[in-house]
């Protein structure tokens, strides 16, 4: 039976769902190394039609997983995009077959640093090979082909998920009809790389790091918590932090900080340690930093090969992935006469991960784009 909290969030829910796993023989990475075997954790919602042309792949951000919608048994909270996935929602499961998978290099069921090395019976940890955004997409392509799907109706994602969607459009241009890129970029700027580098250095400087070969009993928890705290600062806008925290003191008897914002960041860091792996954090942030489709003329040249319609969404308050990066993508698409709809949502008190949050305006934008099947239709 759903809990009262589940009922609160479950209007139009896909209900109780289960993460599945599939094993492929191998995946050759862009760097030349091979993952053998390749494991992919995934969830699906809705039904694949006979023509197999109603499938939508949704791609998660840095700390996400395959659980995009519905509830796992005993969960109080639904999947990370539950507001937008389900019967009658933007990604309507009465109409579409939604696929969500955990990226390789992550720590939520797909091949990554926590995978057991068959040669010694221990987790690969820091000996796992480097994984790129392109490798993540190539792994997803194996999953899509497993379902017998030749052409996806859409690929959608925000932040790192948006990078995956972009990579799909250039790596497999004939295999998707629509591409939705939210709060993302064609490559990281020096500032974005700098934020991630600080997080990685926090992990590397933890006394328990041990060259990435730590035990579960002695993980680099302090370093990972600091990395998450740094990340959360970049997710929030200045106005949101002023409205939510200001200079308020922390609630309760907290000795380690004098301000509410400090208490919030400490909580985010400590809770993150319980659900994420430090090696995966390093692998995934490096994949983000090394992803590059270029900018300007270089990006225009790369995007000349795409064959799908685009929806690009940016957020005025997002200073981690500022709107100018989305505008660069749009300009390059327009030069190539690619049908593209661009929306910049102006919510001063918003945040980078606004694409994950419930929003009637955002729901309408996604719904209208997906339902407008004629090429060249603009919002």
Swiss-Prot record:
Ranges of residues in domain AB hydrolase-1: 54-332
Which residues catalyse the reaction?
Answer: 159 (nucleophile), 318, 352
Tell me what reaction this enzyme catalyses: L-homoserine + acetyl-CoA = O-acetyl-L-homoserine + CoA
Q: Which organism is it from?
A: Leptospira meyeri
> What Gene Ontology terms describe where this protein resides (cellular component)?
cytoplasm
What compartments host this protein?
Cytoplasm
Q: SUPFAM superfamilies, per this entry?
A: alpha/beta-Hydrolases
Annotated binding of substrate, by residue = 228, 353
Which keywords annotate this record? Acyltransferase, Amino-acid biosynthesis, Cytoplasm, Methionine biosynthesis, Transferase
**The organism sits in which domain of life?**
Bacteria
Q: Which GO terms describe its molecular function?
A: homoserine O-acetyltransferase activity
Q: What is this protein called?
A: Homoserine O-acetyltransferase
| Similarity-based family | Belongs to the AB hydrolase superfamily. MetX family.
Tell me how this protein assembles.
Homodimer.
Which NCBIfam families is this protein grouped with?
homoserO_Ac_trn (TIGR01392), PRK00175.1 (NF001209)
The region annotated as signal peptide is none
RNA-binding found in the keyword field: no
What are the BP-aspect GO terms?
homoserine metabolic process; methionine biosynthetic process
Upper taxonomic lineage:
Bacteria, Pseudomonadati, Spirochaetota, Spirochaetia, Leptospirales
- Per its database record, what is this protein's job? Transfers an acetyl group from acetyl-CoA to L-homoserine, forming acetyl-L-homoserine.
């Amino acid at each position: 039976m759903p809990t009262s909290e589940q009922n609160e969030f479950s209007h139009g829910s896909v209900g109780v769902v289960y993460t599945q796993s599939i094993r492929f023989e191998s995946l050759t990475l862009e760097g030349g190394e091979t993952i053998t075997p390749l494991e992919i954790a995934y969830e699906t919602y809705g039904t694949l039609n006979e023509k197999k042309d109603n499938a939508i792949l949704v791609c998660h951000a840095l700390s996400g997983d395959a659980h995009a919608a519905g509830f796992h048994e005993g969960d109080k909270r639904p999947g990370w995009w539950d507001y937008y996935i389900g019967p009658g929602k933007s990604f309507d499961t009465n109409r579409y077959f939604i696929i969500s998978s955990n990226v390789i290099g992550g720590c939520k069921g797909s091949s990554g640093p926590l995978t057991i090395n068959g040669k010694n019976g221990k987790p690969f940890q820091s000996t796992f090979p480097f994984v790129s955004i392109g490798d993540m997409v190539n792994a997803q392509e194996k999953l899509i082909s497993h379902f017998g799907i030749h052409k996806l109706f859409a690929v959608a994602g925000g932040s790192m998920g948006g990078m995956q969607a972009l990579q799909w459009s250039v790596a497999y241009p004939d295999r998707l009809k629509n591409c939705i890129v939210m709060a993302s970029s064609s490559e990281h700027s020096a500032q974005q790389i700098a934020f991630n580098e600080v997080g990685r250095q926090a992990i590397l400087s933890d006394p328990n790091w041990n060259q990435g070969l730590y035990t579960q009993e002695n993980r680099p928890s302090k370093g990972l918590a600091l990395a998450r705290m740094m990340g959360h600062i970049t997710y929030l806008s200045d106005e949101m932090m002023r409205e939510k925290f200001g200079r308020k003191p922390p609630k309760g008897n907290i000795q380690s900080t004098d301000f509410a914002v400090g208490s919030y960041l400490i909580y985010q860091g400590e809770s993150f340690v319980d659900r994420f792996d430090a090696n995966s954090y390093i692998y995934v942030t490096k994949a983000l930093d090394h992803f590059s489709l270029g900018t300007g003329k270089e990006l225009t040249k790369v995007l000349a090969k795409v064959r799908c319609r685009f929806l690009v969404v940016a957020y005025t308050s997002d200073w981690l992935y500022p709107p100018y990066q989305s505008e660069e993508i749009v300009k390059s698409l327009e030069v190539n006469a690619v049908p593209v709809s661009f929306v910049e949502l102006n919510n001063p008190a918003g945040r980078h991960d606004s694409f994950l949050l419930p929003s009637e305006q955002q729901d309408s934008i996604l719904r209208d784009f997906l339902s407008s099947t004629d090429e060249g239709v603009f919002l």
